[in-house]
């Protein structure tokens, strides 16, 4: 039976996180302490140092030889069940698509375990778990390890597979089956392209004597010339050569859609920004925000042209300076921008009515646009005679996707922190080696700030968004149902199937009811696959997560 003391322990663990988030929100919305440029600096620190070091701290201090394999099996089975059901739906239903498979998989299986899960589950089940021989904090760390190393990598694989399909369909609609190899230039880090999506990539085919094609993928001439124009607007002290970045972190994006080069930071009007933030009306007044059909959102003119927002970026573009003039809504990237469509006039601020199906546009049957801000894309269903569009051999596509996923992973600091944490924990617990005190203290002084800074950063993100519910009420309700009902239900079934009972079963179910993870939203933003839905799931889900998890906690404790 849950007592008042138990609830107090839970609130003691979780309320401080919401205090940090609320302070950040108030600092921007009400008190006007931070400008968007300052927010980007805070979040750059969080993305580069605080969160990776926090991950390293938790993973490196977790005993890998005492992992609960049955608990991990339940978590893995849940994700495999959801993935299999979604794949079957896409295969058998005309309303299914790869975009929706990715989005629904993210919503139902990838919670915010690192930031919310560890403190919340410790507060709920620290005593009961210890009595049952299950450390709830350690179990959450084990889930974090699998998320960082396996499931986020799988997400990247699916996103790059989607990008590869679109690239091949658009540029080789009739000859794709003849492709025997791909070579990708080193400055291309994603098949999603840059601000214009796959349109910013060009593929050059070389036909051999055997009739087979060998394709080279590089940035398009127009995107390179845009980059040159962007460099021309910079200070003479800056180099004209592209600067390669292997960092990952935060970017600032303008709410206005524009394809004109924008000098970095020079056009921002802080007074107007605070004016806009103060009145709280900018989300509803945004022209084109709810545009339907095939209409593009109209550019917003007037005082609101300088309002910016930021997203967390899990990977960086190889040309960080170029991003200042990308088609990504007049973006100002504070460091290595992601290669995504962050505000393209083809639908970055528009969303369709609540529907899973693709709608035929008046321009023709081959142009279809997924609901909720997914990239408008050419998706030929057949070749005009009812046959599916041909694709290159599976081995060729797999090699191409693996190359792109590898380029993403090596630019993500969380990849290094997770792997180094696993390696050190294996060495430390196998041979009893302790980390030198100087190194341990150097890490802990930053990792100790990780939880608070991560929540503070999330509060800044919420304050800079035009609307909390960005995808419409219907889609938001559906996303919350998937996040807080479907995910825990499938986890309960998977846990029972592998034999979890008692406290372990309760921990597994509550863990599945945590708010939406940040990283899936970052990926959705970079690849422009329903980013409004994931944004709503992160922001609104965080607001309602505490009462929902408390309800699960109380019901399971009856």
Curated annotation (Swiss-Prot):
The residues on the Extracellular side of the membrane are 1-6, 60-68, 122-138, 440-442, 501-502
What does the UniProt entry say about where the protein is found?
Answer: Membrane
How does the protein associate with the membrane? Multi-pass membrane protein
Amino-acid biosynthesis keyword on record: no
Query: What GO molecular-function term can you cite, just one?
Result: identical protein binding
Tissue specificity remark: Expressed in roots and shoot apex.
Q: Where are the transmembrane segments?
A: 7-27, 39-59, 69-89, 101-121, 139-159, 419-439, 443-463, 480-500, 503-523, 538-558
Q: Where do the annotations place (indol-3-yl)acetate binding?
A: 51, 112, 114, 152, 518-519
Q: Which regions face the Cytoplasmic side of the membrane?
A: 28-38, 90-100, 160-418, 464-479, 524-537
The UniProt keyword set, sorted, is: Auxin signaling pathway, Membrane, Transmembrane, Transmembrane helix, Transport
Q: Which Pfam families match?
A: Mem_trans (PF03547)
- InterPro entries according to UniProt: Auxin_eff_plant, Auxin_Efflux_Carrier, Mem_transp_PIN-like
Q: Which GO terms describe its cellular component?
A: cell periphery; endoplasmic reticulum; plasma membrane
Concerning its family, UniProt says: Belongs to the auxin efflux carrier (TC 2.A.69.1) family.
Q: How does it assemble?
A: Homodimer.
Protein name, entry field: Probable auxin efflux carrier component 1d
The top of its lineage is: Eukaryota, Viridiplantae, Streptophyta, Embryophyta, Tracheophyta
């Amino acid at each position: 039976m849950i007592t008042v003391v138990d609830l107090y322990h839970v609130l003691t663990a979780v309320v401080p996180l919401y205090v940090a988030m609320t302070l950040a929100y108030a600092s921007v919305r009400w008190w006007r302490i931070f400008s968007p440029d300052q927010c980007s600096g805070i979040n750059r620190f969080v993305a580069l140092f605080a969160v990776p070091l926090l991950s390293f701290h938790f993973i490196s201090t977790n005993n890998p030889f005492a992992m609960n394999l049955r608990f991990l099996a339940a978590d893995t089975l849940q994700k495999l069940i959801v993935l299999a059901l979604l794949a079957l739906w896409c295969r058998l239903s005309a309303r299914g698509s790869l975009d929706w498979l990715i989005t629904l998989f993210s919503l139902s299986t990838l919670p915010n375990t690192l930031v919310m899960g560890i403190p919340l589950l410790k507060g709920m089940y620290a005593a009961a778990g210890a009595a049952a021989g299950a450390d709830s904090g350690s179990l959450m760390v084990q889930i974090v390890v699998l998320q960082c190393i396996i499931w986020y990598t799988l997400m990247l694989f699916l996103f790059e597979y989607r990008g590869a399909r679109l690239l091949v369909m658009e540029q080789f609609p009739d000859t794709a089956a003849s492709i025997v190899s791909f070579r990708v230039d080193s400055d291309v880090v994603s098949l999603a392209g840059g601000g214009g999506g796959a349109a910013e990539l060009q593929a050059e085919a070389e036909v051999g004597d055997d009739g087979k094609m060998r394709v080279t993928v590089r940035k398009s001439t127009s995107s390179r010339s845009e980059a040159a124009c962007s460099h021309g607007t910079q200070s003479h002290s800056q180099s004209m050569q592209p600067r390669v970045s292997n960092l990952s972190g935060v970017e600032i994006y303008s709410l206005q859609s524009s394809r004109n080069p924008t000098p970095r930071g020079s056009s921002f009007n802080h007074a107007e920004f605070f004016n806009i933030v103060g009145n709280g009306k900018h989300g509803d007044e945004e022209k084109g925000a709810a545009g339907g059909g095939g209409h593009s959102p109209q550019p917003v003119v007037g005082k609101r042209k300088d309002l910016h927002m930021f997203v967390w970026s899990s990977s960086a573009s190889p040309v960080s300076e170029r991003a200042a003039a990308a088609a990504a809504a007049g973006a100002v990237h504070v460091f290595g921008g992601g290669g995504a469509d962050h505000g393209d006039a083809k639908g970055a601020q528009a969303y369709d009515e609540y529907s899973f199906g693709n709608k035929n546009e008046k321009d023709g049957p081959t142009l279809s646009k997924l609901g909720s801000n997914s990239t408008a894309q050419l998706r030929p269903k057949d070749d005009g005679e009812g046959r599916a569009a041909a694709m290159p051999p599976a081995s060729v596509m797999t090699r191409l996707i693996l190359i792109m996923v590898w380029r993403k992973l090596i630019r993500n600091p969380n990849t290094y922190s997770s792997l180094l944490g696993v390696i050190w924990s294996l060495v430390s617990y196998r041979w009893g080696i302790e980390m030198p005190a100087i190194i341990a203290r150097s890490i802990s002084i930053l990792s100790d700030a990780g939880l608070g800074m991560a929540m503070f950063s999330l509060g800044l993100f919420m304050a800079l968004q035009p609307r909390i519910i960005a995808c419409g009420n219907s889609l938001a309700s559906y996303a919350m149902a998937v996040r807080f009902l479907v995910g825990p239900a499938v986890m309960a079934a998977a846990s029972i199937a592998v034999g979890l009972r008692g406290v372990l079963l309760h921990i597994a179910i509550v863990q599945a009811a945590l708010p939406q993870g940040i990283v899936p939203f970052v990926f959705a933003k970079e690849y422009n696959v329903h980013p409004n839905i994931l944004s709503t799931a992160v922001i609104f889900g965080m607001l309602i997560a505490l009462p929902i998890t408390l309800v699960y906690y109380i019901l399971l404790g009856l």
